[in-house]
A protein has these predicted regions:
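Short, surface-exposed beta-strand-loop junctions and turns on beta-sheet-rich folds
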Residues: 26-28, 35-36, 127
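Small/flexible residues
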Residues: 24-25, 83, 129
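Unchanged
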Residues: 34-124
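Short, intrinsically disordered, charge-balanced linker/junction segments flanking boundaries
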Residues: 13, 124-129
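N-terminal strand-loop-strand
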Residues: 1-30, 41
Length: 129
């Protein structure tokens, strides 16, 4: 038996930096489940905003990226997770505070330079490396 989960999220960029969230002691990209009747574009923007505190009006989708697929077994059932990804530019004030959504288990949000990515990816999920 298998079940399918669809999610949507973004690689958020600003000033040559990428935004990551910290959840379950790992760095990850902001994303969330697609709700019935809501498209993947809108879901990506809403989830980024909810998880980081950035205003939806300051999030500009630049490009749709290739979706990823992730399979895992839970209690004998296979779960297939498809994530729609977007390249998103943050056009707001770079010094605006980031507010992690603690209700979702997010403990930190932080901008990282491309040079710092090696260190960040060491503490991330294998599927985003």
């Amino acid at each position: 038996m298998s079940s399918k989960i669809k999610t949507s999220g973004g690689i958020v960029i600003k000033n040559d930096k990428i935004l990551f969230i910290r959840k379950n002691n790992r760095w990850d990209l902001p994303k969330g489940k697609l709700e019935e009747g809501v498209n993947s574009r809108d879901t990506a923007i809403v989830e980024i905003s909810e998880e980081t505190g950035l205003n939806t009006k300051d999030l500009l989708i630049l490009k749709k990226l290739i979706p990823t697929h992730y399979h895992k077994k839970v209690e004998g059932a296979t779960i297939v997770k498809k994530t729609y990804w977007y390249l998103v530019e943050y056009i707001g004030d770079f010094n605006s505070p980031l507010v992690p959504d603690k209700n979702e288990g997010i403990t930190d949000c932080r901008w990282f330079s491309f040079d710092e990515l090696v260190l960040v990816l060491e503490e991330s999920h294998e599927r985003i490396r």
